[in-house]
Amino acid sequence: MPLVYMNIIMAFAIALAGLLMYRSHLMSSLLCLEGMMLSLFIMSTLIILNTHFTLANMMPIILLVFAACEAALGLSLLVMVSNTYGTDYVQNLNLLQC
């Protein structure tokens, strides 16, 4: 396995570990999710370019669109929670408190 792939897999694993460790704040969770999506985007682009699989050329672009939608929804949720509660704790997102 080339060193580039190992570095991208390690970046994904570090972002996943950060998501699992720092899950109390919504902003840190969103940053870790963005790191995971970025590493998935780079990995899928490299795999498609190296295998010359032309039918899957749209897959990284679709992944990037989903990452942008996820970021927009996450930031709007962050603004809503911080305006309502004054903090960005994930525990404020409990649906049973409605």
Swiss-Prot record:
GO terms for molecular function: NADH dehydrogenase (ubiquinone) activity. InterPro entries: NADH_UbQ_OxRdtase_chain4L/K, NUOK/Mnh_C1-like. Keywords: Electron transport, Membrane, Mitochondrion, Mitochondrion inner membrane, NAD, Respiratory chain, Translocase, Transmembrane, Transmembrane helix, Transport, Ubiquinone. The keyword Magnesium does not apply. GO terms for cellular component: mitochondrial inner membrane; respiratory chain complex I. It is found in: Mitochondrion inner membrane. Its EC number is 7.1.1.2. It is a multi-pass membrane protein. Gene3D superfamilies: 1.10.287.3510. One of its GO terms (biological process) is ATP synthesis coupled electron transport. The keyword Transmembrane applies. The chain crosses the membrane at residues 1-21, 29-49, 61-81. It catalyses: a ubiquinone + NADH + 5 H(+)(in) = a ubiquinol + NAD(+) + 4 H(+)(out). Core subunit of the mitochondrial membrane respiratory chain NADH dehydrogenase (Complex I) which catalyzes electron transfer from NADH through the respiratory chain, using ubiquinone as an electron acceptor. Part of the enzyme membrane arm which is embedded in the lipid bilayer and involved in proton translocation. Core subunit of respiratory chain NADH dehydrogenase (Complex I) which is composed of 45 different subunits. Belongs to the complex I subunit 4L family. PANTHER family: NADH-UBIQUINONE OXIDOREDUCTASE CHAIN 4L, NADH-UBIQUINONE OXIDOREDUCTASE SUBUNIT ND4L. This is NADH-ubiquinone oxidoreductase chain 4L. It comes from Sus scrofa (Pig).
